[in-house]
C-alpha cells in the first residue's frame, strides 16, 4: 500500500469573531489517501490557510522539500519513519511553527490510517491501554463583554457541564492581557471572583482548573493572584505567563501553592525539554497537532513520565483532536485528564457538526474505544457547509 495524495479542507464558521479568543472558529482537515482506497483523517489548531500552503507547497531544494511531495509513494504503515523524513526534509521552512503544525495534522491522519489498515485502535498501537476510561474536563469559554456577563455565563456553563456528567471543568478567565476575551481589560480581582463563583456553583466534589491566557508579564505579579485562588481548590492554573518565560515559570513552580500548566503553543519535544527542565512546569499540555502529531506527543509523554510530571493534552478543536488526545491518554498512566470542548456548550458550529461519529462519552468519561484508528467519522455535509471559500464569498457579497 502506498500514499497517493493529501487532501486538505480549510473550514470557517460563518459567524466567526476575530475579537474572540477561540480557535474553534476555523480548522484544517487533512485526509491522507492510499492506492487501496483507505484514508486517514487529521486536523491541527493553527492558521488553516497557511498550514494548507505548507502541505502543498513545492520543494525547490533539499533543505525545503514539499511535504506532500515527500509523502506520495510512502508506505503509510511507516509512521515514525515518515515523521523523521518530513522533519528533516523541511528543516529550513519547517522545524518549528507552522511547518510542525502541518506535519502534526499529517501525522495524526497517518495514525488513523495505520489503525484502519491493521484493524487496531490507536491506543493499542501505542503499547496498550493503561486505563479503562479517560476523564474529560469541560473547557468553558464565557460569552459577553462585561465582568457581570462573564460571571453569569461561566456559572451557567459550569452548572450545565456538571449536569451533563462532567466531573471537572476549566474556566477561561482571560480578563486582561493581550488575549483577553472580547478586549476586556479587568483587574486581577475578577479572576478571583470568577473562580470563587464557579466553585460555589459546582460544589466541592468537582475538579476546577483556571486558564488566565497569558495574563501577567512577571511571575511575582502572577503569584499574588495565584495565592488568592488557593482556597477554591484549583487543580491547576494555566498559562499565567508568556510562552517563553522559562525563568518565570520556574519561579512559580518553586513558590506556587497550585500546579502550573502550560505548553499549548509549543512545538516538538525540543521545546518541551525546556518546559520540563528549565521552566519546571508541573503539568505539560501538548496540543497533539501543534507538537507534530501523535508520534511526537508520545515522546513528550515519555519525557514527562521520566521527570514525574503530568500530561494533560490541550485541544480546542473538534472530535478529531479530542479522539487523538483520548488515545494518547489511554496509553499513558500520567495523563489524568484531557481537554474537551463540549459540543452542547460550544458556540462553534464546527465543534458541533463536523464529526458525525465521535468517541463515546459517559458520565464525564470516555470509555476505551475499539474501532480502528481514531474511531471517528467526518460529517461530509458539514465539511462542505463550512468550506472557507464558500463562507468568505457569502460574507463579501
Predicted segments, located by residue:
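Conserved, mostly hydrophobic/aromatic
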Residues: 3, 37, 67, 106, ...
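Hydrophobic faces of well-ordered beta-strands that scaffold small-molecule active sites
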Residues: 42, 136-138, 167-171, 208-212, ...
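Extended hydrophobic packing segments that form well-structured cores
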Residues: 372-397
Amino acid at each position: 500500500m502506498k500514499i497517493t495524495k493529501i487532501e486538505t479542507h480549510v473550514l470557517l464558521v460563518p459567524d466567526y469573531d476575530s475579537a474572540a479568543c477561540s480557535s474553534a472558529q476555523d480548522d484544517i482537515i487533512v485526509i491522507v489517501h492510499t492506492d487501496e482506497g483507505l484514508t486517514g483523517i487529521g486536523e491541527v489548531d493553527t492558521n488553516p490557510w497557511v498550514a494548507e500552503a505548507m502541505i502543498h507547497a513545492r520543494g525547490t531544494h533539499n533543505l525545503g522539500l514539499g511535504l506532500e511531495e515527500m509523502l506520495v509513494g510512502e508506505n503509510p504503515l511507516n509512521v515514525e519513519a515518515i515523521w523523521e523524513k518530513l522533519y528533516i526534509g523541511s528543516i529550513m521552512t519547517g522545524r518549528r511553527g507552522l511547518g510542525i503544525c502541518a506535519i502534526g495534522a499529517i501525522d495524526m491522519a497517518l495514525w488513523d490510517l495505520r489503525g484502519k489498515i491493521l484493524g487496531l485502535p490507536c491506543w493499542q498501537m501505542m503499547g496498550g491501554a493503561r486505563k479503562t476510561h479517560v476523564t474529560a474536563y469541560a473547557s468553558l469559554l464565557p460569552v459577553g463583554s462585561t465582568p457581570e456577563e462573564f460571571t453569569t455565563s461561566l456559572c451557567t456553563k459550569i452548572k450545565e457541564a456538571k449536569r451533563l456528567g462532567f466531573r471537572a471543568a476549566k474556566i477561561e478567565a482571560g480578563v486582561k492581557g493581550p488575549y483577553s476575551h472580547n478586549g476586556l481589560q479587568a483587574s486581577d480581582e475578577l479572576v478571583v471572583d470568577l473562580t470563587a463563583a464557579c466553585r460555589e456553583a459546582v460544589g466541592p466534589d468537582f475538579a476546577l482548573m483556571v486558564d488566565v491566557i497569558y495574563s501577567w508579564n512577571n511571575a511575582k505579579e502572577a503569584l499574588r493572584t495565584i495565592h488568592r485562588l488557593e482556597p477554591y481548590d484549583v487543580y491547576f492554573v494555566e498559562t499565567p505567563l508568556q510562552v517563553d518565560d522559562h525563568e518565570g515559570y520556574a519561579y512559580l513552580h518553586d513558590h506556587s501553592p497550585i500546579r502550573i500548566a502550560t505548553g499549548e503553543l509549543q512545538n516538538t519535544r525540543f521545546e518541551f525539554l525546556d518546559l520540563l527542565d528549565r521552566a519546571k512546569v508541573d503539568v505539560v499540555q501538548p496540543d497533539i497537532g501543534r507538537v507534530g502529531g501523535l508520534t511526537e506527543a508520545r515522546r513528550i509523554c515519555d519525557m514527562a513520565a521520566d521527570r514525574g510530571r503530568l500530561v494533560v493534552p490541550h485541544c480546542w478543536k473538534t472530535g478529531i483532536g479530542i479522539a487523538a488526545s483520548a488515545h494518547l491518554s489511554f496509553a499513558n498512566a500520567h495523563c489524568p485528564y484531557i481537554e474537551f470542548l463540549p459540543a452542547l456548550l460550544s458556540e462553534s458550529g464546527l465543534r458541533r457538526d463536523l464529526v458525525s461519529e465521535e468517541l463515546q462519552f459517559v458520565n464525564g468519561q470516555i470509555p476505551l474505544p475499539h474501532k480502528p484508528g481514531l474511531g471517528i467519522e467526518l460529517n461530509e455535509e458539514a465539511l462542505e457547509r463550512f468550506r472557507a471559500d464558500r463562507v468568505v464569498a457569502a460574507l463579501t457579497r
